């Protein structure tokens, strides 16, 4: 059974590229364009991993991360934060809120897929 990945980003081009990349890499993918949608999708889709952009309308990726980590039933969901903000303070904030990994944009496709596989315990 394919692992489930939820992509959360408000930029359509990034979502389309990530969706294509991850489906070709064997993942079942759903997308959300804002924080509220993301939380609904985590509830219904039950992803193994959330690929979470930091800067979004309504709720930031930080807010979404905090809310996911506040729910014991979602404790096993891995969170990989993506952001153009690569300053040490932003990375530290994401990790302290419970993100498993923080990757800065731009990133290589191979690096991203490798990071996802590692987080999901795949070879």
PLM segments and residue spans:
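Receiver (REC) domain active-site loop signature in two-component systems and cognate sites
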Residues: 56
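Short, conserved "switch-loop" micro-motifs in signal-transduction and mechanochemical regulators
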Residues: 71, 85-86
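Two-component/phosphorelay signaling modules centered on CheY-like receiver
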Residues: 12-30, 119
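Acidic, metal-coordinating helix/loop segments flanking the phosphotransfer/catalytic sites
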Residues: 31-49
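C-terminal output helix
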Residues: 107-117
